[in-house]
Amino acid sequence: MNFAILKNTLIAQKRPPHHIALIERAYALAHTAHHGQKRMSGDPYIIHPLATALRLAEMQLDASTIAAALLHDVCEDTPHSLADLRREFGDEIAF
């Protein structure tokens, strides 16, 4: 699982470029924040939020929901705070 799979899904769905850009920004922050973290399986941690985001994209949910999925463990598992996410992405995504 990598971001290209999610991005290709979004493109195939003809999502607006600004929606894809929002999701890319969320992925970039999540990828950086979770750098070096592993799942119990040994896989990179980012696989979990990516898989969640892909499932939501396949369900045709909106860009804010997909971005929130990518970021959903950032506040729990990294030094980033909810206030950090709120500043970067707004209240709709950082809830």
Question: Where are each of the predicted segments found?
Answer:
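Active-site helical microenvironments for divalent-metal-assisted chemistry
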Residues: 1-95
